[in-house]
Every structure is written in C-alpha cells, then in structure tokens.
A protein has these predicted regions:
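Leucine-rich repeat
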Residues: 5-8, 26-31, 52-57, 75-80, 195, 216-217, 230-232, ...
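Extracytoplasmic/secreted cell-surface and envelope-processing proteins
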Residues: 91, 457, 488-490
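Canonical leucine-rich repeat
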Residues: 21, 44-47, 59, 69-72, ...
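Leucine-rich solenoid repeat scaffolds
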Residues: 376-423, 471-507
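LRR N-terminal entry segment and analogous cap-like coil->beta motifs
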Residues: 1-43, 47-68, 73-80, 215, ...
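Concave beta-strand-loop units of leucine-rich repeat
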Residues: 12-18, 34-41, 60-67, 83-90, ...
C-alpha cells in the first residue's frame, strides 16, 4: 500500500492484512503520523518511508522500519515526539537527521543494538527504552544533550555508565527489570536528580547517599495503595540494606515488593545524622522484622510487612495512613492522634486495640482471628471492612458527625473520580466498590448497642451494606442492640435477624 499524504494535518493508518506500507511524496501540512499493524502481521509488517514532511511534530509507529526506508530524521527533521513500538529500528542510520527531538520512546525485541550518536547535541528531554534485547548501551552521546528523564525497562543490560548524564540536567532516572549488578550514583551526584527508580535489578548494594542533597523520591519497589495488598514480589532484587540516614530532602520511598530488604536505616548514631524529611515509606512484601520511625515527625504514610513484629510510631504526629502485615505479634495496641486510615493483616493477633486513635476514619482488616474488635470509641469511623477473618465480636461506634450520611456521598464521589484509586485494571478499587460502609465477613457477634436510633444511612451503609447481608454464610449469629432502641428500629432489626437466622440480644 502506497500513500501520498499531501494536504492532511494528521494521518492514521492501521493495516489488517497489508504487510507493507509505503509513504512517499511531500507534505508541508502534515503534523502527526500514526501507523500500526494488527497482531497477526505485526511481526512481519514493515513501513517503507520515502516521504518528506518538514513540519511533522509527532510520529507514532507500531511495527518494523524497512531497510528500504530513508532515514526517519531526514523524512521528518523537526519531529519532537517519536514513539516506535515493536520496532526493529531498521538499518544503521535509520534515526539520523532529527533536529529537535523532545521525547523518544523505543521498544521491540528485534532491537539488539543502539547507537545514540544521532542524539548528540539535540535538546532531547525524555528517552525511554523498553522490552528490547540491548545488552550494552553507550551513554556518551547524551553528554551534550539536555536530557531530563531516562527510563530503561526490561532490557538485558548488565552495566551502565552514568557519568555522561551528570551535566545534562537529569531530573528522573529509572532502571527496571535489567541485569545491572552495580551502579555508581556518584556519577550523577549533581544538583538536579530528584527521582530515582531502581526496581527488580540484581544489585547487591544500593548506595543512595551521593544523592543526599537532591533526591526527593526513591523507588525500589511499588507504591502501595491503601485499599489493596501488594501485588508482586521482585525476585531479582538482591540488596538487603537500604540506608536512608544521610538523605536531606527525601520525601517518598516506595519499596513494596522488594523482598530482599531486611533493614532500613533511618539514622546513623555514629555520624549523628538521621533522615527527617520522609513523608511516605512503603515497605510491604519485605523481610523487615522491626522498624522505628518515631523520629519521622513529617511521616504521613507508612506500610510495612511481611515479617514485621515491631513497629514504633511514637512521635509520628502527622501519620495518617498505616498498613501493617504482622506475622508474630499477638497483642497490638495503637496510639495515634493523627491516624485516619488503618490496614492490618496478621493471623496471630488475638487483641487489636485502636481506641486511642480518635481520628480513625477507615479500617480494613484481613486474615485476623482476634476475639473481639472494639470500635466504640472511634466515633469518626465511617468505613470498616473485615475479610478472610474469624472475629468473635465487633462493637460498632456511634458516629458523632451530624453530616455523616452526606460524608459517604462526598467520599465515594471523590474516590470514584480519582484516576489512581479507580484503576480496576490494576486491582485498585474505590471506597464505594471496596468498602461501601461497614462490610463484615465471618463475625459471630455484631454489637450496635451504642445506637438508640437507627437512621436510614446507618442501616444501609453500616449494618446491612445496602439493607441486606450480601453473603449469607458470612452473616453474624448474634446482634446486640440497646434495650432503649426505638420500637420501629427493633422491629427492623428483628426482621433482618429472622432472615439471616441470627439471635437478637438486648443490652
């Protein structure tokens, strides 16, 4: 198929059967080009480019570049945004001639080698290379660029020299799912690098101290969402210690799934230093047994597990979210005036107390066999979810907020509109989908004696999750009510109890 796009601004071609797409002619109006092959011919389909479009700004090609093509840079010299998916990058020199690239994305298992010399002297800001067979990558040509973001993912690279990036103005460096065993961050210890991501690489040691004056965000694993458990353990990760004690500007550390980590150092008594700026620390799926975060006065979010038996959150006066996967403790009492969200998982715990957490707003508990959970004093608790547990008794609070019914609608709407927490394809769900009020599974006794009058919101959102117990096998055997409960509510409770074969007890 031959195409001559003379007067259009945007050209999009999808091939369902034609194995070759040839572009020829000249166009001064074309600004965007999008070409792709369907899966059946993706491996063999190729683009033959022999056209000239000097004003094109964006190129998006999924498929191979034919060896018969002219250099893409000579065809589209002023292209700023170039995305090449499942490509082979074509013959040597296929990318020569570009004058003003800002973003370049390349992926494809047929890419086995790449010479970055075509980028030398260009003001490129973002370079992403993923899912290739490149084992060596010479960064020297990037020395004279203005590269801000470098992202390398799923490439068999074993060694990477970072020195050429030192003066480019690099802001974000990401290396994931590669075979790099060592990394010298002194080579990029400039004044600009604020985000570092090193995930699932067989590094035996990771020293981030050279970035102590600039680094703000560190990824060695995943960021944890409050309403999900961690989804993946990175098996390539080898380093066991993560020393953060020297960091002066570090705000977020995301390490969920980094299964090799046993120790996180937050202070160094010998050097009289400690990290003070941390706001988020995500360490689900690690081998950390104990952690003392008491000195982190700015900490807002903490997730730690799977082997944790001790966690000191004293003096964390701004802590709002806490997630613990606890394998050893049988008695856990939390005390925090700021804590709003608690996620807890621990099969051995027999007593879990949160009565000294007055601002507690949402609680989700998994895999617990505590005899009782008393939330009577938690009068701000609007969301409670218990899964895969065997709880003897749960005592509900009487929510003190006058507008708590309206609060449900506000929060459900807020979380439904959040593109991160609403991403179902990632296993992340909204408040409404995941909790929707008090959702109790496998609890023998439900105590609602704090209530003397049941509003419609309380019935719908707390007690019966939409006026009905959804899963009959998980309904309570006993419901404790206040003997002063108004008669109409007693009647409603008895009707519900009869339906689920539960006993009503006056208190």
């Amino acid at each position: 198929m031959t195409t001559e796009p003379l007067y259009v601004k945007q050209l999009s071609i999808v091939s369902f059967g034609t194995k070759s797409i040839e572009l020829s002619g000249e166009s001064n109006t074309l600004e965007a080009l999008d070409i792709s092959f369907e899966n059946e011919i993706l491996k063999t389909g190729e683009v033959v480019c022999k056209m000239y479009a000097p004003n094109i700004k964006e190129i998006d090609i999924t498929g191979n570049i034919s060896t018969k093509s002219y250099s893409l840079g000579k065809c589209f010299p002023k292209a700023k945004y170039i995305y090449l998916y499942d490509t082979n990058v074509g013959k040597s020199g296929t990318l020569d001639g570009f004058q003003d690239i800002e973003t370049l994305f390349i992926s494809g298992k047929k890419v086995t080698d790449m010479n970055l010399s075509f980028l030398s002297g260009i003001t490129i800001h973002r370079l992403e290379i993923e899912k290739t067979k490149i084992s060596k990558l010479d960064m020297a040509p990037l020395r004279k660029t203005k590269l801000n973001v470098l992202d390398i993912d799923n490439c068999p690279i074993k060694k990477l020299m970072l020195l050429p990036l030192k003066n480019t103005g690099i802001v974000s460096l990401s290396i994931s799912n590669c075979y790099i065993t060592s990394l010298n961050l002194k080579e990029v210890s400039n004044k600009t690098l604020t985000t570092l991501s090193i995930i699932n690489c067989p590094l035996k040691k990771l020293d981030v101290s050279p970035l102590k004056n600039t680094l703000e965000t560190l990824y060695v694993g995943d960021r944890q969402q409050f309403y999900t458990k961690y989804r993946e353990v990175y098996k390539k990760t080898k380093f066991t210690t993560l020393d953060l004690s020297m960091m002066k500007k570090l705000k977020e550390v995301y390490g969920s799934g980094a299964g090799s980590i046993k120790t996180v150092r937050l202070k160094n008594p010998k050097k009289h230093v400690r990290v003070k700026t941390l706001q988020e620390l995500h360490l689900y799926g690690t081998k950390i047994k104990s952690i003392d975060v008491s000195g982190l006065t700015k900490l807002k979010k903490l997730y730690v597990g799977n082997c944790t038996t001790k966690c000191n959150i004293n003096k964390c006066t701004k802590l709002e979210e806490l997630g613990i996967i606890n394998r050893g403790t049988t008695d856990l009492s939390l005390k925090s005036k700021s804590l709003k969200h608690l996620q807890y998982r621990g099969g051995k715990v027999k007593k879990l107390s949160v009565k000294k957490c007055p601002k507690l707003y949402a609680v989700t508990i998994r895999g617990t066999k505590a005899k009782s959970l008393d939330f009577k004093g938690n009068k701000n608790l609007l969301y409670l979810s218990i899964y895969n547990s065997n709880i003897g008794k749960v005592v509900y609070p009487k929510v003190k907020k006058a507008d708590w019914r309206y609060e449900y609608k506000i929060q459900d709407k807020r979380f439904s509109s959040d593109p991160i927490t609403n991403a179902e394809e990632s296993g992340i769900f909204t408040y409404e989908h995941y909790l929707g009020g008090y959702n109790i599974n496998q609890v023998k006794t439900v105590d609602i004696s704090a209530w003397k009058r049941l509003s419609s919101a309380m019935k719908k959102r707390q007690l019966a999750n939409g006026y009905k117990f959804v899963m009959k096998q998980y309904t309570p055997r006993r419901i404790i009510i206040n003997k002063k409960l108004r008669s109409s509510d007693k009647k409603w409770i008895r009707a519900v109890a009869k339906k689920i074969k539960a006993k009503v007890i006056m208190w």
